[in-house]
Amino acid sequence: MANLSGTTIMLTGAGGALATAVAQELVDAGAELILVGRGESLKRAEDRVPATEVLDLDLSDPASIEELRRHKVDALVHTVGAYGMQDAHKATPDDLNGMMTANMTTLFHAVQGVLPHMLKQKEGMIVGVSAAQAARMSGKGAALYTASKAAVAAYVLSLHDELKGKGVRGCVVYPMGAIDTPTNREAGMTWEATIDPRGMAQSIAHALTRPPRAHLTELKIYPDV
């Protein structure tokens, strides 16, 4: 198991299926958590795992940046996001704005919130969750989703290249399939065809503990089939 004792990690999307698994894994590894989420989902997360602080914030709002800057963290794990499909010829500007806001703007605001402290202490890690479609650079029936998740990957990798000399690293996580969640099971997906969220959480914790000269900048995580 990864050892994250003495580390403070900000986890966004608290209460979601993946974030719940990540939160438990990080706590088990000894990390202190700052949970960021909204409403009932955030409350569920607060009830399930101990957290140093709990922030009910809308990360699509630029005002969230200043609130996040009040908190000193060693790593950011960003799981906020949305999925959507539509025929390319039926997509609207609102569809584009909504998808980019959910997947890219929220990440940008979270990063802008935590980055000043990371740069000051000359150490930090930013983990962003992308998608299989972005890894393949193709998503039939989900062009806007694919583009927004590709933006996530490009942003995090660019941050890594720009800031690694200042102690701040980046890692992109690509779930190369659906994650095992109640929603996906209700949709008829079988457990063996989906990714174990706790296993994915363990992979993220592993990435967070890599030494400076052995970075993991991209993780592709697959189900069994």
Regions found by a protein language model. Name each.
Residues 15, 23:
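N-terminal Rossmann NAD(P)H-binding glycine-rich loop of SDR-like oxidoreductase domains
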